[in-house]
């Protein structure tokens, strides 16, 4: 998950994964789930800005979809899919069935 602690929707998704039993199980059983705290507002000259730019390039610029954005990598670190989170939303939160469908479609078993 690429986003940041400045992003309400990023925090909502992290909370959703933690509290929704089915989603939590799907994530923990099939993925190494990492949070990338990306801050597009940081100023040039900050050492973390260059590192963040390099990471976003390596991940095929997922920030173009907004935040949060989900990047699925294979076991070698190659980008398989970038998911815009808006397709998983419902109201002021996230939809369990849409999220489970997304996760199921990108499990290691599904992509082999």
Regions found by a protein language model. Give the residues of each.
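N-terminal post-signal-peptidase region of extra-cytosolic proteins
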Residues: 19, 52-57
């Amino acid at each position: 998950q690429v986003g940041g602690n400045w992003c309400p929707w990023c925090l909502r998704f992290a909370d959703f994964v933690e509290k929704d039993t089915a989603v939590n199980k799907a994530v923990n059983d099939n993925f190494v789930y990492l949070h990338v705290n990306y801050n597009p507002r940081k100023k040039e000259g900050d050492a973390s800005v260059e590192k963040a730019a390099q990471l976003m390039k390596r991940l095929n610029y997922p920030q173009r979809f907004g935040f949060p954005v989900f990047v699925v990598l294979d076991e070698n670190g190659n980008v398989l899919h970038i998911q815009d989170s808006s397709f998983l939303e419902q109201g002021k939160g996230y939809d369990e069935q849409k999220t489970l469908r997304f996760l199921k479609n990108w499990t290691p078993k599904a992509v082999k």
